[in-house]
Amino acid sequence: LGQENTIIDVSNAYFDTIHRWLPMVSKKRLDMGLPLQNAGPDLAMLFLAMKLITEPVTPVPDLTLYREAKTFVALLESDGVISLFLLQAMILIAVYEFGHAIYPAAWMTTGACARYSDILGIGPGDFTILEQVVSQIGRHLCGIVS
């Protein structure tokens, strides 16, 4: 991702495309967040997943970025990072895997997302985390896939 302009381009590409049918990441929350240079690795992972999911489809996909994203998720998990940003990144990776027919990884990642949401206290019909997000950013609701 490197430079701030790249992150802005990735964010714009994501919100212009994927976000239209999977409104899971709050643009307002990202815009109100910390300056990018002060952000944590979980936010960097989310931007990496946003870049991955918005990459143009090619006849023979280059899986380098995908492998880097999977490795970064594993590193964050082993470091004990628990955050909504990381869950959102994992969901985007699962969508990428399903879209590119990367099996059984797609099922494994989906299962990991379900278990990770349990750690965050997000369950079917449980909107506690949403209420916390809404209180932080006003009436803007951030959707979550459960």
Predicted features and spans:
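Acidic, Ser/Thr-rich, low-complexity intrinsically disordered regions in fungal proteins
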Residues: E4-S146
